[in-house]
Amino acid sequence: MCGILGIVLANQTTPVAPELCDGCIFLQHRGQDAAGIATCGSRGRIYQCKGNGMARDVFTQQRVSGLAGSMGIAHLRYPTAGSSANSEAQPFYVNSPYGINLAHNGNLVNTASLKRYMDEDVHRHINTDSDSELLLNIFAAELEKHNKYRVNNEDVFHALEGVYRLCRGGYACVGLLAGFALFGFRDPNGIRPLLFGERENPDGTKDYMLASESVVFKAHNFTKYRDLKPGEAVIIPKNCSKGEPEFKQVVPINSYRPDLFEYVYFARPDSVLDGISVYHTRLAMGSKLAENILKQLKPEDIDVVIPVPDTARTCALECANVLGKPYREGFVKNRYVGRTFIMPNQRERVSSVRRKLNPMESEFKGKKVLIVDDSIVRGTTSKEIVNMAKESGATKVYFASAAPAIRYNHIYGIDLTDTKNLIAYNRTDEEVAEVIGCERVIYQSLEDLIDCCKTDKITKFEDGVFTGNYVTGVEDGYIQELEEKRESIANNSSDMKAEVDIGLYNCADY
C-alpha cells in the first residue's frame, strides 16, 4: 500500500513542492519506507527529490526549495512486491516519449507476462523489480505508438486504454507529462482509492489535486472533491488557469469493489473513501463485534475493554459501549516508532512491539481483559500484547479482531505476508488463541464486516484476503513469484543488488 498525490496550481509562479510535501505528511500512514516528489518547471524540465525514509526526513528545506514548478506528484512507499532499496523509490521517470513521471499505488498480478511483452515485443528494459516501473513503461509504450511531435488529451486517453487492456490488478496512479499535464487513473474494479478535488482562488482560478485519501483535501482547503470511478481517468493541463480538467470513462466499470482492508486498517479514520466514512465503518465494526462477543462470552467474563492503539480505538470504544463495559487505554504508544504492520521484515516487527507499546499495569492487574485490535495478521503483535497484559497481572485475556480471520495473500498492494506466515492459515480459532497465548480469539464475521462498510451504491468489496477469491483472478505462478520476492527481500539479497542499480532520473537523492 502506498500514498499518492498530485497538484496543479493555477499560478504558475508559485512552487507546488511545499504543498506536496505537506500533503505527504497527511498520507504518511500509508507508507513509511520511502518518499518522493517530482515537479515540472519551465520548458518542461523535471525536478525530483526522493529517498528512503519518512517524508520529514527526505524532504528537507534545502531539497524542497530546489523543486521548481507549479505542477507535481508525490509518492509514499510501503514496500510490496519490490525491494525496499533507494532505486525503488517513486516517482519513476522515463524520458521517452515526452518525459513521463508516474507514482503508483497497488499491485499488478500479471507481471510475468507483462515483462515478457516489454522485452520481446516492445523492447523496453525494466531495470528494477517494481511493478510500478513496469506500469510506467507500458503506458510509455502505448503513448509512443502515436509517434507524434506533441500529444493531446485524446492520445493520453487512448494510451490508457492500452494500459487497461494489458494490466490486471488493483492500481491507482498519478503522473506527469513534461510541460503538458498531470493525469490520474484508477483500476476498473476500484480496488485502490483515488480522489480528485478543486480549490477556488480569490481571482476565480482553480487549483487541482489528486490524492489517495480525502483527508488531504480538507487539510488544504480543497472543499470540492470526489472519487474517480473505476476505469476513469482525468487530465489536468499544466496551465490550468486557461484550461479545464478533462475526465473520461476510459473503460467500462468492471465492478465497484474497494479493498475492505482500507476501512479495517489502512485509511485514516477522518477520511471518506468512495463515499464511505472510515470512522463510521469502524464504529459499526465495534457494534457488530460486540454482538458476536456476547454469543461466545458471558457479560461477567469481561471486566474491561482495552484497544491496541491507534487504529482499533474507534472500534473498541463502540464495542465497550455495546457491551456495557468500561473502556480503558491500557497501552501507551511511543509515537516515534513506526506502524509495525508496515515494517518491511519480521525481525523489525518483533523488536518494535515492546518499544512501541508500554502497558499500564493498573488497567490490567487482577482483571479479565478484552483486547480489541483491527486485525490479526502474522500474530507477532498480538502475541506480544497478550504477554504484556498477563505480565501486568491480567487474570484472563480475550482477544477480539475487527476483521475476519486472514488466511490468504493480499495481492493488490498490502504486504500482509506469505500465506504460510499468516497465523490463521490452516489453524482453527482455538489454535490461534493457543499460539498467541490468550483464553479465546473472537473474529468479526465477513458478512458483518461487509454490512459495516456497504452503501446503497457499493455492496461488494475486494475480500480476497478472507476468502481467497480475487476479483481480477491471478496469473499462474504469480503468488509463488510474490512470495519468492518477499523471501528475497527478507534475506536482503534483493536490496543489496538494488542499492547499486542505475536509474536514469530514478536514483534516489541520498
From Swiss-Prot:
Keyword flag Glycosyltransferase: yes
Pfam annotation, one family: Pribosyltran
Database matches in NCBIfam families: purF
GO cellular component: cytoplasm
Family: In the C-terminal section; belongs to the purine/pyrimidine phosphoribosyltransferase family.
Catalysed reactions listed for this entry: 5-phospho-beta-D-ribosylamine + L-glutamate + diphosphate = 5-phospho-alpha-D-ribose 1-diphosphate + L-glutamine + H2O
Obligatory cofactor(s): Mg(2+)
Keyword Glycosyltransferase: yes
Domain of life: Eukaryota
Active-site residues annotated for this sequence: 2
Top class in the EC scheme: transferase
EC number(s) per entry: 2.4.2.14
Note in the entry: Present with 18700 molecules/cell in log phase SD medium.
Binding residue positions for Mg(2+): 373-374
One GO term of the biological process aspect: purine nucleotide biosynthetic process
UniProt protein name: Amidophosphoribosyltransferase
Cofactor-binding details, from the entry: Binds 1 Mg(2+) ion per subunit.
